[in-house]
């Protein structure tokens, strides 16, 4: 038998790689001589670059960029081959990079994300995938675009630096300096984005995500006014209303900038990851796929790893099952997306803290139970 293991990480306990190692241990105990392969996968959030690089044997590319508070930072993105690159905006512009006492979305910038993109283009990459979760910013992506040559001018014609507080001050957008390789559509951009928020309004970038980035109600009102000004200018420049583009409000409005200036495609994170790693090709000859995540519930069918893996397996006619930490309301919906069965790691009533402390032991036990059940079913 040939097994393929492709589970998401269990937050705070098990990495995607570790789940594959434990599944391999259990499978070899129950099915001696079986063939096992593990894939690190992610849904476009934290760890996406590492997961993709591991799956395709890619390489890290270090680069020095500006952090969210304009400090210099050493970060990395990934090269899959000579043409394709993958990166996380959180590497350069992520919330964990900003100390809690300094969190103010009026001051943070995506400039460093733009520097990563520029570095990738300079190195010859022409197919760039960008994960935009975990941002510290609410600058509408103007910092990122400024790093790529766009100028945002105030009423006196002075160039703005590119942070959230600058949005309300913009009077003119000058795209004449935008990197010609981008202008001439020589670079393809894919943005991993699973939120559908518009740029402005109650569900927009400021009011939906600004609070978690340190924004007070007064700050959010200021940022919303700035976003509305920015939206109107983008409409004038590109003829597109970013309040009508699902995902434009992602990452503090970075989704809008990448769409408008770079002609990027906004796409599900897990779908992008599975495409990058050539998942369907890896299903050839596989008897069973085992996937999973920390908790299965109604949210699992919305762009999560289990849904993505299960749907691909269903399409290719390969059975898939899942091991999860726990199950919540609506978990059974995943059965409509290619997952045949779910096994939980928790084997009795216990506090969450105990379940996390015993994560490896409990996961291995669940894997053994699952493979024993599979062995029994083969004899029917």
Annotate each predicted stretch with a short phrase.
Residues 1-132, 136-380:
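N-terminal loops that bind phosphate or other acidic moieties
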């Amino acid at each position: 038998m040939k097994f393929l293991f492709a589970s998401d990480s269990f937050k705070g306990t098990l990495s995607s790689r570790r789940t594959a190692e434990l599944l391999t241990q259990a499978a070899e105990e129950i099915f001696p001589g079986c063939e096992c392969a593990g894939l690190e996968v992610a849904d476009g959030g934290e760890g996406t670059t590492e997961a993709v690089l591991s799956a395709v044997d890619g390489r890290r590319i270090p680069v020095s960029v500006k952090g969210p508070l304009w400090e210099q930072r050493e970060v990395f993105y990934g090269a899959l081959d000579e043409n394709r690159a993958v990166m996380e905006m959180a590497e350069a512009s992520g919330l964990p990079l900003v100390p809690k006492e300094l969190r103010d979305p009026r001051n943070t910038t995506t400039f460093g994300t733009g520097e990563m993109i520029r570095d990738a283009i300079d190195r010859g990459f022409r197919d760039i995938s960008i994960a935009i979760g975990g941002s510290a910013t609410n600058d509408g992506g103007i910092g990122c675009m400024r790093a790529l040559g766009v100028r945002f001018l105030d009423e006196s014609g002075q160039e703005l630096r590119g942070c959230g507080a600058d949005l309300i001050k913009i009077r003119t957008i000058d795209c004449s300096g935008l990197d010609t390789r981008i202008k001439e559509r020589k670079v393809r951009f894919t943005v991993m984005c699973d939120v559908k928020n518009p740029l402005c309004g109650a569900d927009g970038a400021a009011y939906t995500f600004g609070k978690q980035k340190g924004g007070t109600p007064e700050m959010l009102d200021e940022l919303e006014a700035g976003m509305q000004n920015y939206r109107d200018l983008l409409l004038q420049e590109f003829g597109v209303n970013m309040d009508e583009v699902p995902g434009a409000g992602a990452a503090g409005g970075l989704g809008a900038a990448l769409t408008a200036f770079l002609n990027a495609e906004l796409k599900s994170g897990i779908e992008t990851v599975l495409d990058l790693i050539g998942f369907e090709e890896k299903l050839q000859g596989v008897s069973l796929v085992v996937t999973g995540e920390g908790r299965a519930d109604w949210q699992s069918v919305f762009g999560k790893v289990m849904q993505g893996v299960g749907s691909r397996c269903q399409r290719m006619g390969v059975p898939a099952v899942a091991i999860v930490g726990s199950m919540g309301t609506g978990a059974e919906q995943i059965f409509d997306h290619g997952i045949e069965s779910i096994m939980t790691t928790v084997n009795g009533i216990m506090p969450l803290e105990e379940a996390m402390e015993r994560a490896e032991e409990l996961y291995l036990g669940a894997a053994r139970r699952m493979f024993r059940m599979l062995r029994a079913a083969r004899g029917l």
